[in-house]
Amino acid sequence: MSSRVLTPDVVGIDALVHDHQTVLAKAEGGVVAVFANNAPAFYAVTPARLAELLALEEKLARPGSDVDLDDQLYQEPQAAPVAVPMGKFAMYPDWQPDADFIRLAALWGVALREPVTTEELASFIAYWQAEGKVFHHVQWQQKLARSLQIGRASNGGLPKRDVNTVSEPDSQIPPGFRG
């Protein structure tokens, strides 16, 4: 087992017990590493060196500047928690997934690259409102994640086309055809 000794002065525990005043007086820097069974056991420190170390620790505990900043600069505003119904509930129009929904979806095995759009959320809510089923909030989020995964994958990851747009003819001639 390796250990780090923080002083060059090393003494056995028997020598320290026999004459601790002489050992500490000869110690460079007022500190001695005490070994027992060929391994470091503890450090013996003179009262003067202990006072120096405590003064240094107190000095380091104080701020390095005399400028005092307002406590409000250190306090981040608390986000107003969204009221999520306890237990199981039916889907309602104002339901929202949690702010860390994408991270949670990844934990459930659904990798979402983009957050849920308002259209996707509205479609999900409308469908499940009509169903009238009840689930816990986490279960609703899991259903939303799976719904997004299936919906986005069904079109090769592309957004759904608007059926009201007028299609434009392709002006390129495929290879092998004459133009």
From Swiss-Prot:
Q: Which GO terms describe its biological process?
A: DNA replication, synthesis of primer
Q: In its keyword annotation, does this UniProt entry include DNA-binding?
A: yes
Which keywords annotate this record? DNA replication, DNA-binding, Primosome
Q: Name one GO cellular component term.
A: primosome complex
For region Disordered, the annotated ranges are: 156-179
**InterPro entries reported for this sequence:** DnaT, DnaT_DNA_bind
Pfam families xrefs: DnaT (PF17948)
The entry's family comment says: Belongs to the DnaT family.
Known role: Involved in the restart of stalled replication forks, which reloads the replicative helicase on sites other than the origin of replication. Can function in multiple replication restart pathways. Displaces ssDNA from a PriB-ssDNA complex. Probably forms a spiral filament on ssDNA.
- Subunit and partners: Homooligomerizes. Interacts with PriB. Component of the replication restart primosome. Primosome assembly occurs via a 'hand-off' mechanism. PriA binds to replication forks, subsequently PriB then DnaT bind; DnaT then displaces ssDNA to generate the helicase loading substrate.
* Name this protein carries in UniProt: Replication restart protein DnaT
